[in-house]
């Protein structure tokens, strides 16, 4: 299994002694939804030299194809050898995690790199999808001679295990795996020169395995390697048989110290390999090899073991494991090592201490450790002796001949062994000192290079700091200027915002103040239209008056003519105008008074026309068209002849009969004069009152028109009234509801009804009487 490295620094570190690690990694499962590829790099042979023909300082980088495509910094790498060599030995274990759904398209790339020149010496790509989960592959990787002649002789030795998040479960098996925890040798050894490695396997038939081992079957001797040539020609290279008669051998890390090796390492054997099928011939086989053989030119030629330990896995052991509480396991305190020359300080054969348990879950939570393995029930030594009886006899018979020969050569061999041991120890000390000297020289060289590089970096950093300080000062000054400019800008925007808000408030107040003014303006316009209609009504009444005057003058002019001959004799012509009706006495004085009144009436009439014309010329500049008020034909006389005559009128002041005529021409007789004078006096009084009202109304209307015109011009030129101004002296005109005649509009405006009534009561009755009299 070896030492696991989960986080590697930027520069590879020197190789550490894995035998000194007291806490090995016992995590056999990958995280959920992921898979882990564990790669143990043992060593390499015949590595190519660098481009400058110098020997490399090799180390191995392990990454996936996706990491290599994305140029990610490699996190899984081994240590660097202590000296330049073409046959390095590492013994490091690295892990690479990938997503479970990406295993079908991911490859694991092993690159041997040179530490000094960062050159790639050789690389191999192993498809993950071809690897069987939880099966230990012991690879001998090489290149095809046709592909690359420079690396054709290079060999890389590694163990690759693909781990999933769950242990596989197969039909017919109650348990998923058997875990074996090997602690170490119980007593110190006296003749062990180097650390030891252990090859552990579970064989379904120990008898057949021993026979194959005696025949020197390559699959049962040492650690069988799977040779893989790149590029890979067929996926059958990674094929694994369903059940192997030789088991699935697993290699431990080197156990030290040599006097009493200690491993504290677990081995996991799956149920699909028959490890959980306890039978009479199933056995756990542990083979011990010296780790010194790994330093030769062919490091994996583990042919002759130092000893063998065998634990029969019979059915009563299975039942014994199930009866325990907690973990389903047992511990064996003294499992002997057979067929060995190793001796303890007591002169006895050594023994090892181990523990094992059955795993039933696909994702177990508790694996064996140095602490919890001591809590397992201990296997009874008597039962162990019974199980090992036949095995001990078989090993003793085979070793009897060798023991007799050893007794003959024992005195001389002891001396030779002592001499060899002393020479070997001296050689090991010399090699250790040389290795330590090389390490110190390398450290000194690295320290000198680091010191030189650090001094150069300090000078560069000092210059960069000075430049950075200058640039920071400039940036600070620019930032201060920008801050000041932005502060002024913010102040300006705040002032502008305040002015905008004040202006908005003013406009809002002005809008609120103009709302009643707009309504008032609309009322003024309605008032102008109504005033225009009233003026049209007045003009129409003037036309009526003029027409009546013309008719009156015409009738008076006709009276100057002699009476018709068919008129009855002795009857006055003006019976209707009797003195009793007029109330004025007859005589010369009455005639003069009537003439004076009529003259005054004509003069006043002329003056009123002039005044009306003047007021008309001084009216408002804005003239709104208004439909003239209709004239009731009944008011102008029966038969409508007066209305027909009024249609021929050209307007006020344009009557054809407005000339002043002598009084004697109009009064032909005494009775007629008095009657007409009475009527004229009555009409005179009525006309005077009407003219006074018309004059007052015309003046009032002229003033209102002028004020409205001035205000309209002010509104058009922008001289609007302030919101606090108060409009006074503006009469209110009520709107007409449900009536459209001008006469009803005059009544609805609030004017006194006698403005229209005199035009009817003062003019219409007299006009009717005159027309009736003239007829």
Curated annotation (Swiss-Prot):
Task: List the Gene3D superfamilies.
Answer: C2 domain
Can the keyword Coiled coil be found in this entry's annotation? yes
- Renumbered to this chain, the Basic and acidic residues biased-composition regions fall at 7-18
Coiled coil feature spans? 414-561, 672-715
Q: Does the keyword Transferase apply?
A: no
Q: Where is this region: Disordered?
A: 1-23, 68-87, 735-775
**UniProt feature, compositional bias: Polar residues:** 71-84
Name of one Pfam family that matches: C2
Query: What are the annotated GO cellular component locations?
Result: peroxisome
Query: Keywords assigned by UniProt?
Result: Coiled coil
Q: What PROSITE patterns does the database record attribute to this sequence?
A: C2 (PS50004)
Q: Which residues form the C2 domain?
A: 12-141
* Name of the protein this chain belongs to: Coiled-coil domain-containing protein 33
Which organism is this entry from?
Rattus norvegicus
Gene, per the UniProt record: Ccdc33
